[in-house]
Amino acid sequence: MKYLLHDILKWSFSERKETAGMDVKIQRNQRMLAAFGMLGFAVGIVYANLMTRDYIGNIGIFNDFFLQQYGMVEIDMPDYLWYLGRIRILPVVLLAMLGYTRFRRVVVSAFLLWTGFSCGMIMTASVLQMGIQGLILCLIGMTPHMIFYIAGYLILIWYFYTYPVMRWNAQKTVSTILFLAIGLVLEAYVNPILMQGFLKTL
């Protein structure tokens, strides 16, 4: 009985120690992923501040003519959904293909750096060009579909970055496809309504 109790306590302590070690590793990975995104975002802010105002004005979403036309045009939702599907699926496919190579961590890090850089540059450029209205325009431009895109991408990113500890399964496949599909539908059918409603107030 004495030895049995000793073995149970030893096993319990060992399991807690292993669990604690896993928690530390998870937290470290989370911090690393967040750091890559934040670094890219900071570089994007700096880059946007170095651009000239004329150059910023020529960027598609900040061009006055583009904004006027977008606010008045009648969008064919099915065609727009098909267009979005083609341009949104490509990055997912590339990330998935490159993620299955031995450079998966480098791929994930580069993806987060580029995503953070793009967000930082666009949001800063919008403020420089249009003030607070530009920032609101950017936020509305990412609503509500971006939440689902982020959720779908995070499943892929977390899997590739923590492999082989994290394993892929049917649940992850279904969740990723579902999140991305919902994001596409919302971007095609809901976001244009929000964008046009806001542009009419400018």
What is the meaning of each model-derived region?
Residues S14-N29, G71, L95:
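Cytosolic juxtamembrane amphipathic/interface segments immediately preceding
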Residues V24-I56:
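N-terminal signal-anchor transmembrane alpha helix
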Residues G40-G44, A48, P91, Y149-G152, ...:
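Alpha-helical transmembrane segments of multipass membrane proteins
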Residues N49-Q69:
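Interfacial/capping segments of alpha-helical transmembrane domains
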Residues Y70-A96:
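Interfacial helix-start motif at the membrane-water boundary
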Residues L98-G120, A170-A181:
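Cytoplasmic juxtamembrane regions at transmembrane-helix boundaries
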Residues W114-P144, N191-P192:
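Hydrophobic alpha-helical transmembrane segments of integral membrane proteins
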Residues Y153-L202:
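Terminal transmembrane helical module of multi-pass membrane proteins
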